[in-house]
Amino acid sequence: HYVYEKIKKNVQLTSISGGTDIVSCFVLGNPNLPIYAGEIQCKALGMDVAIFDDNGKEIYKKKGELVCKSAFPSKPLFFWNDNNNIKLQKAYFNKYNNIWHHSDYAESTENNGYIIYGRSDATLNSGGVRIGTAELYRVVENINNVIECVAVEQKYNNDTIILLFVKLKDNIQLDESFIKIIKDKIKSNLSPKHIPAKIIDVLDIPKTKSGKIVELTIKKIVNNEKIYNLNSIANPECLEEFRKKSQITN
């Protein structure tokens, strides 16, 4: 709403879901269609996009897995130095047989648009409720003095808990009163299930060189798993803070 209220009312503001591997988008904007807040406008031309549940059943107006059911013009034939297409198969075809699984947690809408809730392999599970990280970030990053945040699951006592890491503005302390503000905002805007077990302040949040938060790397760090490739991370030095502070919960 900010852009339309403060900058310009008749601008096309939209997002996408796609990727480098397909040199394209599965869902994207269209200047001939209306724009609805929080939604990507439509499927891309030539893309047989759908939302599947975990059993491979197509669902509507419910959260699930973004897939492409048919071949498309820019579908990669193979990855470089990937003998027998092992990496390609593991990346996109392991979950559903012969159907491209894009690993976006998404929902189709009554407007024929799409909502992306985050990467499906980084979604959180709280008491059996699946939570997309993007919906949590939208609430937390709208709180005054929060610059950005990231949430991941940590294994704990044969279960998992949600850790929320927040980067705050300079000279702002994450004290008990601020933690309560964050939890209350999450509860009122989302649900009690969305409230993390721990809220932890960090100096910086690790990102790729293209600016994407590396949720899966952070998840591995807090679960004491081996990280094999740090070359794509622009600020790997901040990972150690995540490792140290996350161990407080164990």
Residue ranges and their predicted role:
Residues H1-G113, S120-T123, L136, N142:
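Conserved AMP-binding/adenylate-forming
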Residues V11-Q12, I162, I195-K198:
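Residue-level recognition of the N-termini of beta-strands and the immediately preceding loop/turn
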Residues L13, V49, C149-A151, K198-I199:
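Generic structural signal for residues in well-ordered beta-strands
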Residues I16, F52, V152-Q154, V202:
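Conserved beta-strand termini and adjacent loop/short-helix elements that scaffold enzyme active sites
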Residues K43-G46, F242-N250:
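Acidic, glycine/GT-rich loop-and beta-edge segments that sit at the periphery of enzyme/chaperone cores
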Residues F72, L77, N98, S103-H194, ...:
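AMP-binding/adenylate-forming catalytic core of the ANL superfamily
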Residues I199-K209:
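Short proline/glycine- and acidic-rich turn/helix-capping motifs at secondary-structure junctions
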Residues K220-K226:
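Short arginine-rich
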